[in-house]
């Protein structure tokens, strides 16, 4: 049971109406001069003064003064400074006295902070940045984590190369632990979410399949905003597991406008290889300048188009092939969404359905995801002091032929990068097996990546439920209390097959299954207050709350290393069990 309590104070600001003061009438010849002050009359040092549409500019000095030469009458003078409204004034030849007003939109910007509390950004005592939902839709990323790339300072996104839906790693302000566990806590609508959904061991030598992380389950269309909390304050609010920071996700609610609103959207995107590894294109297969059709190196004779005998005994003219480029396809991502928003008096309802299909650049690798969301919120009671909010979200993810990680022969990337450059990978695309049912490949080691697609396939499915509900009561305009409950649960099933004829299992086949069950329940209460001008111009806020978390995870892996009847994939068909 974790109890949290905190308080902070700060100045309450009174902001005058925006405007610009007048201009002294004293003729100057081609030099625009003046003074810049704020609403209190204090000089503004370092304000930018520029002729709009040009590079002719300067900054104000210690007394807020400036002098700008080569200015024509009628030119627009633009004055700006952080935290103030930008001013544009046409110059009529006289010195300028300019008053900058506070940018009330920036100072009064309300953001969603820890535990779902809304605060003015200026009053926060810790670093945080917010990204609006529209900005996350610009690139239409399969994994939501990738959409943060370049949008938040100090956030490093390490993208996965493991096909569609692969995990992406997030680090806030560098590495905080030598163990490598540096990822922030993910919180959706005030409820923590598990960002690790598991990996699976493949059949041959147990390399790993990346089955994606929690953020890859979230539909970007449902997001209102994402906030990034950095520093120790995140740990103070969410406990030790938030020591690496927190990413807060706020999802959409129904509109407050009367009537029914329908939004339909769709997108199509394509992906292809951008940067390919560079390999030497002078020498062919072999070593020490000598050709050898069984050698895996590319330091044989110089390639001049000479005739040679290939791995299959046929004769051809030697040439260099770009196997990396020739292996990958053009990936296509399709996404369709529809959402309904309905307002009934004081109750709003939001429903959305999204379908995403991703055909990877990797031949045979595919991912599909379906998101269904239902959310309702309402206010009731005297003066609408009571408010209730509830949401249920279901996500189904299906994947086929996720690429295998590790420096293993059944890793397509590893195989292609280590092939001799005078062997064409496309020669093995069809057929992939001979008349004896064995795999066609140029050497006795490694696996034909086209064979893996059909005869060493893997697939997995994940069903996830995200649920939360809250009840809030507002005692006064500055004091309220809230209780909240949330649950994150998912069920993952995986299957891997190895057909007879593979070089590591020529006579028999292999079959394995895996399953994982996970749930986390959170129950919390929070009493919070915020009041401006509590002591003169000073205001303050406080919060007191607690959280009870219940978490459980179970898993089961089964493997049949030698099937009695080849290619009959059943756990009952085998005489050897690898558990």
PLM regions: where:
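Short, acidic, small-residue-rich periplasmic hinge/interaction motif at the N-terminus
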Residues: 14-52, 76-85, 92-137, 145, ...
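Flexible loop and strand-edge segments within Gram-negative outer membrane beta-barrel domains
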Residues: 273, 314-354, 358-365, 371-445, ...
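Membrane-spanning beta-strand positions in outer-membrane beta-barrel proteins
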Residues: 76, 156, 224, 259-263, ...
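Membrane-embedded beta-strands of outer-membrane beta-barrel proteins
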Residues: 66, 170, 247, 338, ...
């Amino acid at each position: 049971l974790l109890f949290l309590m905190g308080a902070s104070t700060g100045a309450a600001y009174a902001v005058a109406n925006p405007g610009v003061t007048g201009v002294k009438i004293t003729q100057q010849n081609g030099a625009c001069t003046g003074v810049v002050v704020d609403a209190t009359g204090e000089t503004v040092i370092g304000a930018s003064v520029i002729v709009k549409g040009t590079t002719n500019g300067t900054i104000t000095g210690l007394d807020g003064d400036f002098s700008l030469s080569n200015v024509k009458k009628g030119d627009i003078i633009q004055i700006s400074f952080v935290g103030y409204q930008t001013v544009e004034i046409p110059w009529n030849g006289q010195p300028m006295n300019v008053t900058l007003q506070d940018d009330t939109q920036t100072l009064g910007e309300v953001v969603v902070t820890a535990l779902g509390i809304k605060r003015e950004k200026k009053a926060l005592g810790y670093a945080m940045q917010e990204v609006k939902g529209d900005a996350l839709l610009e690139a239409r990323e399969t994994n939501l984590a990738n959409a943060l790339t370049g949008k938040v300072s100090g956030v490093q996104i390490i993208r996965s190369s493991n096909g569609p839906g692969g995990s992406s790693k997030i680090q806030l302000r560098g590495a905080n632990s030598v163990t490598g566990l540096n990822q922030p806590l993910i919180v959706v609508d005030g409820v923590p979410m598990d960002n690790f959904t598991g990996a699976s061991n493949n059949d041959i030598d147990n390399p790993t399949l990346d089955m994606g992380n929690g953020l890859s389950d979230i539909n970007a269309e449902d997001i209102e905003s994402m906030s990034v909390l950095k520093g120790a304050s995140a740990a103070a609010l969410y406990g030790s597991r938030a020591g690496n920071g927190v990413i807060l996700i706020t999802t959409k609610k129904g509109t407050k406008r009367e009537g029914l609103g329908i939004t339909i959207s769709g997108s199509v995107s394509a992906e292809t290889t951008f940067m390919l590894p560079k390999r030497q294109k002078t020498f062919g297969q072999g070593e020490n300048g000598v050709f050898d059709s069984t050698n895996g190196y590319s330091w044989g004779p110089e390639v001049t188009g000479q005739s040679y005998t290939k791995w299959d005994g046929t004769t051809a003219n030697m040439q260099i092939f770009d196997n990396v480029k020739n292996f990958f396809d053009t990936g296509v991502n399709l996404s369709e969404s529809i959402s309904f928003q309905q307002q009934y008096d004081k109750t709003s309802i939001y429903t959305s359905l999204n379908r995403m299909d991703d055909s990877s650049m990797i031949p045979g690798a595919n991912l599909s995801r379906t998101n269904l969301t239902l959310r309702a919120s309402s206010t009731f009671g005297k003066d609408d002091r009571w408010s209730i909010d509830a949401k249920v979200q279901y996500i189904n993810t299906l994947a086929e032929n996720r690429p295998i990680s590790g420096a293993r022969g059944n890793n397509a990337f590893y195989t292609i990068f280590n092939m001799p450059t005078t062997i064409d990978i496309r020669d093995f695309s069809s057929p992939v097996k001979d008349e004896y049912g064995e795999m066609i490949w140029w050497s006795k080691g490694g696996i034909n990546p086209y064979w893996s697609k059909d005869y060493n396939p893997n697939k997995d499915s994940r069903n996830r439920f995200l649920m939360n509900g809250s009840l809030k009561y507002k005692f006064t305009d500055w004091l309220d209390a809230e209780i909240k409950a949330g649950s994150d649960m998912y069920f993952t099933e995986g299957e891997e097959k190895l057909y007879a004829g593979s070089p590591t299992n020529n006579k028999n086949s292999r079959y394995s299954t895996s399953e994982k069950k996970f749930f986390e329940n959170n129950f919390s209460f929070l009493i919070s207050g915020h009041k401006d001008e509590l002591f003169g111009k000073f205001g303050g806020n406080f919060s007191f709350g607690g959280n009870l978390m219940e978490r459980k995870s179970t898993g089961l892996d089964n493997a049949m290393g030698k099937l009695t009847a080849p290619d009959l994939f059943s756990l009952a068909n085998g005489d050897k069990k690898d558990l």
